[in-house]
Amino acid sequence: MKPKIFYLLINIFFCCVCYAQQAYNVRSPYDPATQKLEAALRGEVLQFTLDNSAIYPGTQREVLVYVPQQYDGSQPACLLVCMDGILYDATTVMDNLIATGEMPVTIGVFVNPGIVYDHSQEVVRYNRCKEFDSTDDTFARFLETEVLPRVEGMQTEQGKTISLSQDPNDRCITGASSGGIAAFSVAWHRPDLFSRVYTSVGTFVAMRGGNNYPAIVRKTEPKPLRIYMQDGWYDVWNPIFGEWFEYNLLMESAFNFAGYEVAHLWDRGNHSIKYGTLAFPDAMRWLWRGYPAKVEKGISNNGMLQTILAEGEDWQEIALAHAPKELFACSDSAAVFAVGNNIYKVSSTGDITESGKLKAGERLLGEGLTTRGSALYRHGQKVAEGLHGLQAAYALSDNRYITLCASNAHSSDKVWVVNAGCRALAIAPDYRYCVTGEAHTHHLISTIIDTAGNMRYSEPFYYLHDLSNGTLQPSGAMAFDTQGNLYVATAMGVQVADHNGRVRAILSLPAGEVQGLAFSGHYLYVLCGERLFVRRMNAVGHIPSEGALTYPSQGQG
């Protein structure tokens, strides 16, 4: 054989081998759940058009609703939500798994992405990427307030009224590609809506911030989620945004680190629905195994979470007759707040007592601290004036104070003044620096305090995480623990930063974004919308009025 022909044949051989390694494995194991049942045993599929969305204005979409043959309407059914319509031949698989008892009686809701048409019915905007790849809670709110209420109360051909369970343990959500990250985002933001998640070739890449999820999962207190992931070694839809498979590996690693129940199927596929369809029956079996036992929170390997959280303790709600807008720490493991002209004190056990009155035009700034006009008062006595635009204040030891003003007020021996256009202020336990908020950025400002109380060397030092897709909601109240870690109220939770300005832990919220925060003794209080919660911590909050204290440095690592 001539050498040229030989080398040509060798090249052809290796090309064929490489192609075969990337080709689909068409000899996938047979799964009986993929076979259609006879017509009498199949579920019914209903359909409606949703074209009046307030959340995604102008969009039109088809929603399909699968009702299994076993559903009799006598009690609420479990729920499966799937993006992009009926994927995975899901209705056939559900027919089979429900019939064999491997899956509970489950209503399927298959939601297509929105499309906006112009006056001539030409597509002017595809909303899929916006809806599915965004990492905020918008799509979760869309499902909760616009899609699922339309499904509730629908009638089947047999006259059965659809009723959906409101228990997240009875709910599963899934999607492929951008629908995969959408499924995860919904459950991540709203574990009160969904506990079980299946992602196929999930787009955890740099589309609209999904590439940030691995770090955030590692830092966030575990949520009660069970997750099944499928992806292929050759999954790269568009390398501009990243390697899909690499980011799925990063997500799985983060889930394992953070203590989640997670399973995966890595195959030889690329960015396709094929293997996601093959994996769907086993994904459903795994996600629903042990049902109706609850999906539980895991235990994270995050050292900061392990240090600051008290084992077995969770948020406890305190009933409020009227919701305050701000919350302040007291020196006896309690917090104070004002509603109207009344000042209330709340204990860690939930007891609320009236503790004082505000004068006309007076605003509460903390325990015993108020402001009226440009003056600062403590226990009704004026301690400073000329503090125009006074936003926040702390009493320190030795009858000193630190204040935050929106004008160019000046410090004195008695009153230290930070000038900034925000309302968030915290002072380190050793009094050597303070932290102020900075609206519409990811940063908090660290300012050194010299021995004369002068503010020096301010810089954007603390970096906060954000999943709001660019709205950059301003951070709220802040507090230090006795080890110098900073707790910050943000839209995505209480973020806990170390001495070097890095967020190491994020505490999950019981309801909505945190608007107020107070840390006293072992008790962390948070105000979420109009609801107040308290949680016993292992960490101890620092009360500035109790004096400065030293704590070990965390070094520069």
Where do the model's predicted regions map?
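Beta-rich, blade/repeat-based domains predominating
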Residues: 321-334, 358-375, 385-405, 415-434, ...
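Beta-strand-rich domains and repeat architectures in extracellular enzymes and scaffolds
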Residues: 303-304, 314-341
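Beta-propeller fold detector
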Residues: 316-319, 353-358, 383-386, 416, ...
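Short loop/turn segments immediately following the C-termini of beta-strands
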Residues: 338-340, 373-374, 404-407, 439, ...
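Blade/loop signatures of beta-propeller domains
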Residues: 295-315, 405, 453-455, 544-545
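Short loop/turn segments immediately following beta-strands, especially the blade-tip
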Residues: 447-454, 536-544
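Non-catalytic cap/lid and distal C-terminal segments of serine-dependent acyl enzymes
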Residues: 21-297
